[in-house]
Regions:
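Short hydrophobic beta-strand element within catalytic cores of glycosyltransferases
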Residues: 161-165, 170
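Aromatic "clamp/platform" in nucleotide-sugar-dependent glycosyltransferases that forms part
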Residues: 125, 144
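A conserved nucleotide-sugar
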Residues: 53-54, 58-62, 76-121, 233-235
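A charged, aromatic-enriched C-terminal amphipathic alpha-helix characteristic of glycosyltransferases
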Residues: 202-235
Length: 235
């Protein structure tokens, strides 16, 4: 803060973490959203059907999903505990994990201990993330900490209900698809909440709200251009 004239953060919480608790109250701070491409992350019934078929997900299966690194930040072992509670309530649930990381061996061992090996899919690193997002019936993000997770916006863009921990900042929660629970809540509460919100999943288009909040890529680019013009004395 000694040398900068203007400050940007991907969210208010991220800005406070980097620049200080009261940075968002200053006139020289703005949020530059982690925007995503609406042309890629949108409801796509064909991609949903194809991806589910490719990974052996039947019409009667219910698919919970996660996209990200399997590391301490993302709290994957807790995610597995949540899924185990969900699976105990409904045998049709499966879990698909997109991504890898240092905790993958522990995740595989946890799935085996709970007898869930045939219901947990480790998909590894994938390039077509929108197709997987569309395949999900529920997106899980029980992180220990986050800045402003782009995956939460991507899931909303695809119309997927989301259940995140209260450790995840609510900056990107701009639709009624996102729900939060504390990590201290009982696993049965997590399972019940997952069941409730997944039951009302619609895979509808929510881009009007996301764009208005600044999370559509072209909208975000225009806002950034306007900010540069203003700071450069051209506006």
């Amino acid at each position: 803060q000694l040398f900068a004239d203007y400050f940007l953060g991907c969210g208010v919480a991220a800005g406070r973490f980097v620049f200080g608790d009261h940075i968002d109250a200053k006139p020289n701070f703005s949020v530059a959203c982690n925007a995503v491409d609406a042309g890629r992350f949108h409801p796509d019934a064909a991609a949903r059907a194809a991806t589910r078929a490719a990974w052996g997900i039947t019409d009667t299966d219910r698919l919970a999903g996660f996209v990200g690194r399997l590391n301490h930040q993302k709290n994957p072992l807790f995610l597995m505990e949540v899924f185990a509670a969900m699976a105990a309530q409904d045998p049709h649930w499966k879990l698909l994990l997109v991504g890898t990381g240092e905790m993958e061996p522990e995740m595989r061992a946890a799935a085996a201990r709970r007898g869930l090996t045939d219901r947990v899919i480790f998909a590894g690193v994938q390039s077509d993330v929108p197709a997987f997002m569309n395949a999900f019936d529920l997106f899980l993000l029980p992180s220990n900490f986050e800045g402003s997770p782009v995956t939460l916006v991507e899931a909303q863009g695809c119309g997927v209900p989301c259940l995140a921990s209260t450790n995840v900042p609510d900056d990107g929660s701009v639709t009624d698809l996102v729900h939060f629970l504390p990590l201290a809540a009982p696993l049965t509460d997590w399972a019940a909440k997952a069941e409730a919100i997944a039951a009302h999943g619609d895979h509808d288009d929510h881009w009007a709200a996301l764009s208005a909040a600044g999370y559509e890529l072209k909208t975000a680019a225009r806002r950034m251009e306007q900010l540069y013009d203003k700071l450069g004395g051209h506006a």
